């Protein structure tokens, strides 16, 4: 997967955009958000995407994001927080309550590093965002070599990140996949981050300018003679 659209169930999609997003050339969708999450809204959004055979990932930030019919679940582990609630605390409580019924083969964990101090998700998780490049690379190596996480996700959440950081993170990882999300608002930015990240995540621009959002998939289009 090179490209994923991230959809927030608490936001209204632009009119007639779902079919265009599905047929844009993206590799799949993440459904996830930070606040005002309701199971009904998650179900409605999931059903809107039902016509696609592309993977739909539910990013489980609370219980409202859990739909039994979903095929793929992403479990965020926030690495750059000192509040254990977001590294394993909530996870343990959910497993304690539902562990017997969790479809583990459909679950993928992702190591998150949140780097925009003004983002809601940074404030919610008490993320320490004033990190050096060395800090970020250390988190990448921690995710891969200590926690054995399959995904390392740098999240700038609405702000475009530093391509040089992405380049160094990419070089530090061998097997763990590097996902980048945050502030991609043009095909040029998509191409720049895609040079280093295994997967780029495009979110906010969907709600701001659907045409520019759709253009971000074109950087992966196969060239024909």
UniProtKB/Swiss-Prot annotation:
<dbReference type="InterPro" id="IPR039074">
    <property type="entry name" value="GGGP/HepGP_synthase_I"/>
</dbReference>
<dbReference type="GO" id="GO:0120536">
    <property type="term" value="F:heptaprenylglyceryl phosphate synthase activity"/>
</dbReference>
<feature type="binding site">
    <location>
        <begin position="153"/>
        <end position="158"/>
    </location>
    <ligand>
        <name>sn-glycerol 1-phosphate</name>
    </ligand>
</feature>
<keyword id="KW-1208">Phospholipid metabolism</keyword>
<keyword id="KW-0443">Lipid metabolism</keyword>
<feature type="binding site">
    <location>
        <position position="183"/>
    </location>
    <ligand>
        <name>sn-glycerol 1-phosphate</name>
    </ligand>
</feature>
<keyword id="KW-0460">Magnesium</keyword>
<feature type="binding site">
    <location>
        <position position="34"/>
    </location>
    <ligand>
        <name>Mg(2+)</name>
    </ligand>
</feature>
<keyword id="KW-0808">Transferase</keyword>
<comment type="similarity">
    <text>Belongs to the GGGP/HepGP synthase family. Group I subfamily.</text>
</comment>
<feature type="binding site">
    <location>
        <begin position="203"/>
        <end position="204"/>
    </location>
    <ligand>
        <name>sn-glycerol 1-phosphate</name>
    </ligand>
</feature>
<dbReference type="GO" id="GO:0000287">
    <property type="term" value="F:magnesium ion binding"/>
</dbReference>
<feature type="binding site">
    <location>
        <position position="8"/>
    </location>
    <ligand>
        <name>Mg(2+)</name>
    </ligand>
</feature>
<protein>
    <recommendedName>
        <fullName>Heptaprenylglyceryl phosphate synthase</fullName>
        <ecNumber>2.5.1.n9</ecNumber>
    </recommendedName>
</protein>
<dbReference type="GO" id="GO:0046474">
    <property type="term" value="P:glycerophospholipid biosynthetic process"/>
</dbReference>
<comment type="function">
    <text>Prenyltransferase that catalyzes in vivo the transfer of the heptaprenyl moiety of heptaprenyl pyrophosphate (HepPP; 35 carbon atoms) to the C3 hydroxyl of sn-glycerol-1-phosphate (G1P), producing heptaprenylglyceryl phosphate (HepGP). This reaction is an ether-bond-formation step in the biosynthesis of archaea-type G1P-based membrane lipids found in Bacillales.</text>
</comment>
<dbReference type="Pfam" id="PF01884">
    <property type="entry name" value="PcrB"/>
</dbReference>
<dbReference type="InterPro" id="IPR008205">
    <property type="entry name" value="GGGP_HepGP_synthase"/>
</dbReference>
<comment type="subunit">
    <text>Homodimer.</text>
</comment>
<keyword id="KW-0444">Lipid biosynthesis</keyword>
<keyword id="KW-0594">Phospholipid biosynthesis</keyword>
<keyword id="KW-0479">Metal-binding</keyword>
<comment type="pathway">
    <text>Membrane lipid metabolism; glycerophospholipid metabolism.</text>
</comment>
<dbReference type="InterPro" id="IPR038597">
    <property type="entry name" value="GGGP/HepGP_synthase_sf"/>
</dbReference>
<feature type="binding site">
    <location>
        <position position="6"/>
    </location>
    <ligand>
        <name>sn-glycerol 1-phosphate</name>
    </ligand>
</feature>
């Amino acid at each position: 997967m090179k490209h994923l659209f991230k959809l927030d169930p608490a936001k209204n999609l632009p009119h007639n955009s779902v079919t265009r997003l599905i047929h844009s050339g993206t590799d799949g969708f993440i459904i996830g958000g930070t606040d005002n999450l309701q199971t009904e809204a998650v179900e409605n959004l999931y059903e809107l995407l039902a016509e696609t055979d592309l993977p739909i990932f539910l990013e489980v930030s609370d219980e409202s994001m859990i739909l039994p019919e979903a095929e793929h679940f992403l479990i965020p582990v926030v690495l750059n927080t000192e509040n254990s609630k977001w590294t394993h605390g909530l996870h343990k409580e959910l497993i304690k309550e539902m562990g017997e019924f969790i479809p583990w083969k459909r679950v993928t964990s992702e190591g998150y590093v949140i780097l925009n101090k003004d983002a809601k998700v940074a404030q919610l998780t008490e993320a320490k965002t004033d990190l050096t490049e060395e800090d970020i690379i250390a988190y990448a190596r921690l995710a891969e070599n200590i926690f054995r996480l399959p995904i390392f996700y740098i999240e700038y959440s609405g702000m475009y990140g530093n391509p040089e950081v992405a380049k160094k993170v990419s070089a530090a990882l061998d097997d763990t996949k590097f996902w980048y999300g945050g502030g991609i608002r043009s095909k040029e930015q998509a191409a720049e981050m895609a040079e280093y990240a295994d997967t780029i995540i495009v979110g906010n621009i969907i709600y701001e300018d659907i045409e520019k959002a759709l253009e971000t998939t074109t950087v992966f289009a196969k060239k024909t003679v």
